[in-house]
Amino acid sequence: MAQRTEKEETEFKVLETLTTTTTTLCTNNCGVTANPATNNMCQKCFNASLVSAAAGVVESGSILKRSARSVNLRSSPAKVVIRPREIDAVKKRDQQIVNRCSGCRKKVGLTGFRCRCGELFCSEHRYSDRHDCSYDYKTAGREAIARENPVVKAAKMVKV
């Protein structure tokens, strides 16, 4: 009677593995089960630690930028320089905010169509022939075909 059948042995092994596994709790003592992939923290505490770590990095970076600016201001005289790139960036922001058709100035809201020339149009002016589009579709198509289908040259065969 000291021998056990295979079925009984497997049942005991399964029960042993179930009882030996222990659940670890969160390292922040919030009472939720922890995940080893998140440094033995629950998901909520792990996300909170990531946010606080990212905020610390941003704050230290902004302090460095502020100190660098103050050093530059002290060492050089104040000059006001307006760069054309900054002006273009401001104009692009203004264009993105306005939701009006560039052809008829009609409000388009969320139904506007953005053309490849960069303008926003209503349903009547969305096609390139309706708004005198400055984008060259033929050249862009040729370049795309040339990029996607490179010329393949085979090695020459040596005749014997």
UniProtKB/Swiss-Prot annotation:
Cross-referenced InterPro entries: AN1-like_Znf (IPR035896), AN1_A20_ZnFinger (IPR050652), Znf_A20 (IPR002653), Znf_AN1 (IPR000058)
Positions contributing to Zn(2+) 1 binding: C26, C30, C42, C45
GO molecular function list: DNA binding; ubiquitin-protein transferase activity; zinc ion binding
SMART domains: ZnF_A20, ZnF_AN1
Keywords for this protein: Metal-binding, Zinc, Zinc-finger
Gene3D superfamilies listed in its UniProt record: 1.20.5.4770, AN1-like Zinc finger
Record-listed Zn(2+) 3 binding positions: C115, C117, H131, C133
Entry GO CC: nucleus
Residues in A20-type zinc fingers: 20-54
Keyword Transcription regulation carried by entry: no
Residues holding Zn(2+) 2: C101, C104, C122, H125
Entry-linked SUPFAM superfamilies: AN1-like Zinc finger, Glucocorticoid receptor-like (DNA-binding domain)
Pfam families with a match to the protein in the record: zf-A20, zf-AN1
GO biological process, one term: response to water deprivation
Start and end residues, zinc fingers (AN1-type): 95-141
Highest taxon of source: Eukaryota
Function: May be involved in environmental stress response.
Record's protein name: Zinc finger A20 and AN1 domain-containing stress-associated protein 5
Organism of provenance: Arabidopsis thaliana
